[in-house]
């Protein structure tokens, strides 16, 4: 099951207690103090691992805690440090303080590891409290409590290209055609129920990651449909690919305006993101060239942007508008190269 939002309480380990002990050896009846210190409590870490893809392992968990430190022992022996707790999460996981809403960490890279909570210090043994006026102290410190927090984890998948479109527009077909992703494909709405990532190989040395989310419907930004729940997963992408159905009963203009409106309402980040447009199912209708030209003319788009001298594109307009057909393999190769070219220009 795909889980992208979980809450739990986490606690670092408590420090072990210091030891009250006195030296006991043959012929030494009243030896001095030799109580050792307690071990420190274990820390809590979060670590991003590319082999982790969901937060499902933490669903339903109430408390996750590191190990407590062991108590000190006689003969000045230190207690063992408590084992650290390392919580593995997928890259793209944001870690929040659930009480304050503060963003604590944002793990984007594989292998990234952060210290979230420190374990408590171990208590001092009675060997530390010997003094001229107290040669046999019968006191040792208790260990200190470890830090604790209510934590919320939120996963936003990391991909280069994010697909945005209405249900049944052909997103799943496209990602299965040009990548290694194998989503369910059928002729009904909401075939895609969870986000999917696919690696697109353009040539022997180049490629990029594409993300498919459930279809957007009008009113998605207010919570209608499935798409709103997963729009956050394309916030990290470098470019959005708006997919518009050429065979739909609604005009290309109406579909595009609705998609832009929903993504803009959802977040400013999506509204200001670089985007391109793919006109899908071009094999199922006639006069596709005319439809493409009329669509671009209505908005004042060119079919392809040329970046400025700094390599920047105008984000208020699509980088390109291209008609495609996954079923007929029309312009699929051209689409891959066009997307790769844009991604390279962003680096």
Swiss-Prot record:
CDD domains: Obg (cd01898)
NCBIfam families the UniProt entry points to: Obg_CgtA, PRK12297.1, PRK12299.1
Keywords: Cytoplasm, GTP-binding, Hydrolase, Magnesium, Metal-binding, Nucleotide-binding
EC number: 3.6.5.-
Binding site for Mg(2+): 172, 192
Cofactor(s) the record lists: Mg(2+)
Location(s), subcellular: Cytoplasm
Membership in a protein family: Belongs to the TRAFAC class OBG-HflX-like GTPase superfamily. OBG GTPase family.
Cellular component terms per the entry's GO annotation: cytoplasm
Record-given protein name: GTPase Obg
Subunit-structure text: Monomer.
Chain positions recorded as GTP binding sites: 165-172, 190-194, 212-215, 280-283, 325-327
Record-annotated Obg domain positions: 1-158
UniProt function note: An essential GTPase which binds GTP, GDP and possibly (p)ppGpp with moderate affinity, with high nucleotide exchange rates and a fairly low GTP hydrolysis rate. Plays a role in control of the cell cycle, stress response, ribosome biogenesis and in those bacteria that undergo differentiation, in morphogenesis control.
Residue intervals of the OBG-type G domain: 159-344
InterPro entries linked: G_OBG, GTP-bd, GTP-bd_Obg/CgtA, GTP1-OBG_CS, GTP1_OBG_dom, GTP1_OBG_dom_sf, OBG_GTPase, P-loop_NTPase
GO molecular function terms attached to this record: GTP binding; GTPase activity; magnesium ion binding
Primary location group: cytoplasm
Gene name of the record: obg
GO biological process: ribosome biogenesis
């Amino acid at each position: 099951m795909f889980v992208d939002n979980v809450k739990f309480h986490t606690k670092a380990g408590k420090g072990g207690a210091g030891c009250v002990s006195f030296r006991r050896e043959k012929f030494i009846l009243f030896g001095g103090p030799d109580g050792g210190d307690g071990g420190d409590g274990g820390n809590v870490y979060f670590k991003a691992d590319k082999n982790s893809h969901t937060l499902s392992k933490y669903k339903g968990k109430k408390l996750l805690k590191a190990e407590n430190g062991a108590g000190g022992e006689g003969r000045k022996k230190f207690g063992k440090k408590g084992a650290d707790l390392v919580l593995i999460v997928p890259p793209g996981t944001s870690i929040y303080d659930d009480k304050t809403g503060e963003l604590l960490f944002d793990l984007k890279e594989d292998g990234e590891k952060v210290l979230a909570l420190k374990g408590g210090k171990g208590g001092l043994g009675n060997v530390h409290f010997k003094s001229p006026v107290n040669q046999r102290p019968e006191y040792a410190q208790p260990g200190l409590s470890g830090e604790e927090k209510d934590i919320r984890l939120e996963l936003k998948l990391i991909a280069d290209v994010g697909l945005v479109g209405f249900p049944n527009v052909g997103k799943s077909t496209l990602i299965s055609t040009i990548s290694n992703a194998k989503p369910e494909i059928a002729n009904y709405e909401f075939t895609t129920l969870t986000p999917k990532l696919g690696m697109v190989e353009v040539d022997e040395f180049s490629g990029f990651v594409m993300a498919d989310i459930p279809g957007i419907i009008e009113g998605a930004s207010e919570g209608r449909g499935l798409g709103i729940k997963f729009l956050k997963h394309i916030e990290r992408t470098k470019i959005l690919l708006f997919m518009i159905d050429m065979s739909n009963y609604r005009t290309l203009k109406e579909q595009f305006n609705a998609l832009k409106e929903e993504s803009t309402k959802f977040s400013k980040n999506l509204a200001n993101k670089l985007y391109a447009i793919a006109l899908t199912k071009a094999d199922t209708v006639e006069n596709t060239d005319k439809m493409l030209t009329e669509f671009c003319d209505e908005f004042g788009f060119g079919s392809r942007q040329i970046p400025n001298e700094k390599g920047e594109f105008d984000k208020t307009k699509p980088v390109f508008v291209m008609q495609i057909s996954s079923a007929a393999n029309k312009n699929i190769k051209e689409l891959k190269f066009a997307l790769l070219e844009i991604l390279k220009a962003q680096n």
